[in-house]
Amino acid sequence: MYSVVALGGSVVNVDKPERIKETAEILRNGLDSGLKICVVVGGGPTARRYINVARNLGTPETLLDEMGIAVTRLNAMLLGAALGLHDLHVPETPVEAARIVRRNGVAVCGGTHPGHTTDAVAAMIAELLEGPLVIVTNVDGVYDKDPSEPGARKLRELRPEELEELAVRAELKAGGSFVVDPLAAKMISRGQIVTHVVSWEDFRSRGLENVVRGRHNGTIIEG
């Protein structure tokens, strides 16, 4: 069974080496259970620091995208090292990532193209592999509005089209934020990708082999 795991930069963070070790162990256990895994790593706080400094220096937005992608690839190399993949080649496109997973059973990558978030890249790879997508984030699932707002309600299940609608609505709202960005939500909806949105704590306690089968406390997105 193929599975794609999107890890936010808050998970693979150079300031939290123990979390990187734990993440690698969870992924190794998933591989040992027979899963074939592609991991897509975000840039997180490190990318934001570089981008903020560069933006203040007047750097064009396209180059800022490239800087962010470079950081995600460094994070991918770091996680690959934690997995013992010392000859790791970081794929540069979703097609290449899918090809490596089919051949080797595992791949670790970061961003690929300017304007494409790592969650969107993960969704593209999941579509190619026809496997479930797991998004590990800093909230415990998808909410009907910003979780910090009073009355916000966690959604246990929803359809891909509903996810896309929520993501677009959050983007249009001033200061709004959503656990899945609009581009990734669009990719999930287009490909009708079974998606599990879980917190890091849930991911750690349940293990990947349980999460991909819906045994978690997060949100399941399925058509």
Curated annotation (Swiss-Prot):
SUPFAM superfamilies: Carbamate kinase-like. It comes from the Archaea. Inhibited by UTP. Its EC number is 2.7.4.22. One of its GO terms (molecular function) is UMP kinase activity. The keyword Glycoprotein does not apply. InterPro entries: AceGlu_kinase-like_sf, Asp/Glu/Uridylate_kinase, Uridylate_kinase, Uridylate_kinase_arch/spir. Keywords: ATP-binding, Cytoplasm, Kinase, Nucleotide-binding, Pyrimidine biosynthesis, Transferase. Gene3D superfamilies: Acetylglutamate kinase-like (3.40.1160.10). It holds the Pfam family AA_kinase. ATP binds at residues 9-10, 44, 48, 137-138, 143, 146. It is found in: Cytoplasm. One of its GO terms (cellular component) is cytoplasm. One of its GO terms (biological process) is 'de novo' CTP biosynthetic process. UMP binds at residues 43, 65, 112-118. Catalyzes the reversible phosphorylation of UMP to UDP. Belongs to the UMP kinase family. Homohexamer. This is Uridylate kinase. The gene is pyrH.
